[in-house]
Amino acid sequence: FPTRRSSDLVCTAIDEYLDNTIKKHELTRADKEEDRIKHVDACNANTGPIFLTYRAQDAINQVVDSWRQAHDPVYDFVAEDGITHRAWVVDDETVINGLVEKFGGVESLYIADGHHRSASAVKVGLMRREANPNYTGAEEFNYFLSVLFPDEQLYIMDYNRVVKDLNGLSVEELLTALTEKFEVTPKDSEPVTPPQKGSFGLYVDGKWYLLTVKE
């Protein structure tokens, strides 16, 4: 579990989304996309970055580490949760161009979070291109805001959800209802870790169950 993580806050080309350099792994909902398209278009800005990751590159790490060691951060503070946040601005064109070149050698980027935000930003960019047929590619609408984390600095945590109540059902009624879509297997007192895709751990009334989606 790494205690320090660093990322790059950058603008990423929508063309890399369109040509599948940026890999997606979730489907999106049209209504959520439409809501975000309206938001980005009205604000004329990406107000939340897309969380991207990539296979770590020593050459990129070295440039970032060297800059961080040679310069003071523009922001340095401890949040209420005790986590220290520091931000550096890379404002040397030579260093920036070098990083752009090195990232050009990264084969793929992967969306860790932000499928709806990225899809919406790309669609707004395409709308702006259609409205500006003489665009050069340098306009801001050709990019979206993103943070890039090397994979070695990621830690994937459990995606747990706590349900407030059973909506009037008893535990027995809940388990019976679940059998319509899941195989429900009672387990021991130890927490259930999903062993495969389509499986879930359920903790209710002091007991654990393994839920497996029926075909």
Features from the language model and the residues they span:
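Surface-exposed, charge/polar-rich loops and edge strands
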Residues: 4-215
